[in-house]
Amino acid sequence: MERPFVAENSRERERLRALVARSSDEDLNLKLGEGWTIAAALAHLAFWDQRALVLMKRWKQEGVAPSLIDTDAVNDALLPLCLVVPPRVAANLAITAAEAIDQELEQASPELISEIERLKDRFRLWRSDHRRVHLDEIEAILSSRGRGSNT
């Protein structure tokens, strides 16, 4: 079974790893807008990758089922929590969560992947899409402040 999402997830995970490695603590505290900082956005990524991992493990045991969520409400509720996570901890959590879900997706059976695809929710498999949105935003902020990008 072809799994093009594996390469894309890996690419964006490595992009995340490189961004974290070159970001100072000062960089991680930069404001993104609407109350978010770079570190908070990384904690946000960690949360959503961790949620995807929890679902994958549940689905392996119990079968795939829709898991509805009000993402805007969750993100609004998460913001104050993400802001109190120490910046370097948030950055490292983002990498750890990305590694964990990507590994789970790479090792999932073809049958499980097929069941997930039937949900018609691209974000379930293509974790790269969510990472890319936020990494693009973060790199734009860093670039606008002369901190540049190595991607």
Regions found by a protein language model. Give the residues of each.
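Short amphipathic alpha-helical segments, especially helix-boundary/capping motifs
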Residues: 2-3, 14-18, 29-33, 74-79, ...
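Acidic/histidine-rich alpha-helical segments that form the ligand environment
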Residues: 7, 74-114
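Solvent-exposed, charged/polar functional surfaces in cytosolic regulatory/catalytic domains
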Residues: 15-22, 96, 100-104, 133, ...
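Conserved catalytic core of Hanks-type protein kinase domains
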Residues: 22, 44, 107
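Short, contiguous alpha-helical
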Residues: 27-73, 110-151
